[in-house]
Design a protein with these regions (language model features):
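N-terminal Rossmann-like FAD-binding beta1-loop-alpha1 element of flavoenzymes
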Residues: 4-29
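Glycine-rich FAD pyrophosphate-binding loop
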Residues: 22-42
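Active-site-adjacent segment of FAD-dependent monooxygenases/related oxidoreductases
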Residues: 49-112
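A conserved short coil-to-beta-strand element within the FAD-binding core of flavoproteins
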Residues: 122-135
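Core beta-strand elements of the Rossmann-like FAD/NAD(P) dinucleotide-binding domain
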Residues: 146-153
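Flavin (primarily FAD) binding-site architecture
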Residues: 157-171
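Active-site substrate-recognition segment that forms the wall
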Residues: 186, 199-227
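Conserved small/polar residues in nucleotide/adenosyl-binding loops
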Residues: 228-235
Length: 235
């Protein structure tokens, strides 16, 4: 198989890139390790910044988002027994955020690629980029016990931190920048009405909490927690 750009990873990043390149006349092949059903079952973030909503429209994928998403012009900060509202619309020259789940925008991107006959190969196992520093890179993968090869001009890694792409970057050109925090987040998805029409970011002596939402019948809550339970006190 021959294409201009081979994209490893069929999540939102890979699909969005494939869509944008297609609109510029550039051919792509997307390789995804999981099934489409699995990708669409993953629960991820649900608040889209203004720049990304504009990108969805530019990619011709924003119609359902604009119809079903919830525009939020602000958010609340809970601290010291008070609840203060920050007016995003006022302090960002009219910008806002959109509450629209990543699962839904991924579905929209899939449908856009399907309409334009984009090539997305699911259940691609043992994906491996080759000759990535050369002018003729290629990617191999296995599906149904058969090995395939995709020759291309460019290989794009959109498969996340744990994906094969990052591990395939030659050590002499790889640069990594990270900030590791000594805590984690516990997230809960609840089929209940949100406690607030807009997000609440809460500061407390025992840590941070977030009251978020996916819709008016689906809530998402996060609490700041220790990375390891062995570090927790009995109380």
């Amino acid at each position: 198989m021959k294409t201009q750009v081979c994209i490893i990873g069929g999540g939102p990043s890979g699909l969005m890139l494939s869509q944008l390149l297609h609109l510029q006349g550039i051919e792509t092949v997307v390789l995804e390790r999981q099934s489409r059903e699995y990708v669409l079952s993953r629960i991820r973030a649900g608040v889209l910044e203004n720049g990304f909503t504009e990108l969805m429209r530019q990619a011709q994928c924003g119609e359902r988002m604009d119809k079903e998403g919830e525009v939020h012009d602000g958010f609340f900060i809970a601290h010291a027994g008070k609840l203060d509202r920050v007016d995003l619309h006022k302090y960002s020259n009219g910008s806002s955020v959109m509450v629209y789940g990543q699962t839904e925008l991924t579905r929209d991107l899939y449908e856009a690629r399907d309409r334009m006959n984009g090539i997305i190969i699911h259940n691609a196992e043992d994906v491996q980029p080759h000759d990535v520093k050369s002018a003729n890179p290629y990617v191999t993968y296995r599906k149904n016990n058969t090995e395939y090869r995709v020759d291309c001009d460019y290989v794009i890694g959109a498969d996340g931190f744990h994906g094969v792409s990052r591990k395939s970057i030659p050590a002499d050109v790889l640069k990594e920048y990270e900030k590791v925090y000594p805590f984690g987040w516990l997230g809960v998805l609840s089929r209940t009405k949100p406690v607030s029409p807009e997000l609440i970011y809460a500061k407390h002596d025992r840590g941070f909490a977030l009251c978020s939402l996916r819709s008016q019948v689906l809530s998402r809550y996060y609490i700041h927690c220790l990375l390891y339970t062995s570090d927790a006190a009995d109380e």
